[in-house]
Amino acid sequence: MADKETMKNAIVADLTRIVIWKNMHKNSTDQSEKILLQAINLKSILHRSITGVLDSKNDYEGPAFLELKKLMSYLFAEKPGTGEKKEKDAETDALLHIAQYLRGSEWKKLTVDPANDNILPSQVKENPKKQPAKRKRSTSRPANEKPSAPENKQQEKGDIPDEDKQEQPVKKIRKNSTSAVDGKRKSQAERLAHIKELIEEGDNSKAIAQSHVYLGIKPDELKKLFLVKANTCSICHKPSKKLLNKGCCLFSVNICKKCIGDYMENLHSYMVAKKMGIKPIHCWACSTVQKYEDFIEDDNMFYKRFWYFLLVNGKIALPQTNKDKLRPVVDWLLACDKIDEEDKDKIRLYLPKSAAARKKARSTSTVIEKNVESETKQEETETITPKPAEDETPPMKEEVIEMKPPTPPEPVIKEEEEKVSEEPEIPPIKEIEDKVEPMVEDTPEEDKVAESMADFEPIDFSTMLDEDEKPQVNYYGSPIGHVSDDDDEIKEVAGGNAVQEADTESMDDFMDYFN
């Protein structure tokens, strides 16, 4: 059950990222990056659904399923509830192409009903048009007479269909994709280079049409090629030297100072997903979201978390346009009880409006600290010397006189030490007697140990050796690994006579045993 819940959360996270990406790039002209990322996210959703996340009827009623339903209706370019197709453009055609490609190859557990705009569980894995043809062939083959006739016909006309079959797939591949040239598949590097050339030339429609090539490529490779470009803003696509490079679970963004305000406003779409019943799990400030999950419950949650992440880490140079927007957020963060004081100290540095003011604030803070220290020192000196302030010259003499008396107490201390050294013999005896009395209390603990040791049964070592290896007598002449039942023998072994007997009688036998 835990695995299914984690997979559901992963689906929800992917859907929220797609929603954010859509809302952030409404006004962008180049849609190629958007389409590529949506294709990758769609593939991950499909793989997770195929692995068994949506395998019961109850799973089709959750928020992840509803968002997946809306996403598929958008991908199939149909208006919700009407079944009418939208006007075609490059974006919808590309999305439709991706969805059809995925639906034909990997979409096995969910299908789309275009008329009702519903996603229903399907027991059929392949397209319904292909299945009846295969069934007819299977029913026609078992007969003995029928297969012979078509085989002869195919032999007579075998050259033409074979050539057609060889030519048709090559033509389809050349029309729909660039994955093969002259019947040979391209490598991933060649595919990436080809689509990158299409985007640089401005043929976005062709690049979008080839986006299914990227379905087997990791998102990190896409980041390097398309999303993160050196010295260019990911939003306005203008060159700029000073950029803020921020990474996320989905994408990495270079933000210029002019666009950061608009970028933050677009990130409010993150809350749209929350209002639709989706709980945000990951964002590109993952550590702050996990550490402070219950900070905010209003619409500015992600906005404040974003600024909190940047302020605490100190990885942002604040532009002039966002000072007014940032001030209430900083005030709110400082008033929050769940934020650590160390983090609040870092946030307080951003309260001044300019860098000069920050320097002044830091310098004034140091000056204030020095003044406070000097004032405290003056107060201490005043409290120490209020009485001698009446006379000017004598206090110095009195101080000198006062410095002499500390010297005589030193011999006094020595005399006391000598007295103590002379009289250590008698008093410590009483102290030792007092200390010895509680030490007697340790005897019951020894008794307890003896009692606990008495519970152990004797170990029969004879079971651990073979008969040939068993020594019969030890150094003292007593048997090893054997305890006699007679009390007399036990007493002899335990008593002092056993040693004498061993010296006189049994030592010869003992030495013969080893010889």
Swiss-Prot record:
Biased composition annotated in UniProt, kind: Basic and acidic residues: 370-380, 388-402, 428-438
Domain of life: Viruses
Membrane-spanning residues: none
Annotated region (Disordered), positions in chain: 117-188, 362-453, 496-515
Compositional bias segments (type: Acidic residues): 502-515
The name this protein goes by in its record: Uncharacterized protein ORF53
Organism of origin: Ostreid herpesvirus 1 (isolate France)
Phylogenetic lineage: Viruses, Duplodnaviria, Heunggongvirae, Peploviricota, Herviviricetes
